[in-house]
Amino acid sequence: PGLGLFGEVLPMRGMSPDMTDTQQRAVHRHNLKAMMLAHDSSVDEALIDLQQANVARDRMRRRRIARTDVLTQVQANWTCAVHGVWGELDALYLGTLQQVPQVLSKLASFTSVPDAGHWVMFERPDAFHAAVDPLLKA
């Protein structure tokens, strides 16, 4: 989000105050699969619990900023090296992932992790750590 590369609108579902806990959990499951994870099998009850807690704390209910290119605009102000790790199957960048290093030209490095969605660190932790650990040791 914030790269100006957001393509297709994702099939996200909304909540309503009259939903039961079971219905809310079904919406979270659907939304996690639609946006955050590449594999249905990655969604379990513990992850739904985490997502419920995340959504309850969310202060930006609308995602207008996600559809802007604000991050590309502020990269000139970065005062340290910024490295990017994306999941190759990130639903937010399907068809545009290869453009990320071009629009974020100030990235010190760009890594694409195969077989992972937006939450690459959750879905493919070993590959994520293989990409990030050397950066932290540098």
Per-region residue spans from a language model:
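Conserved alpha/beta-hydrolase catalytic His-Asp/Glu region
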Residues: 8, 22-80
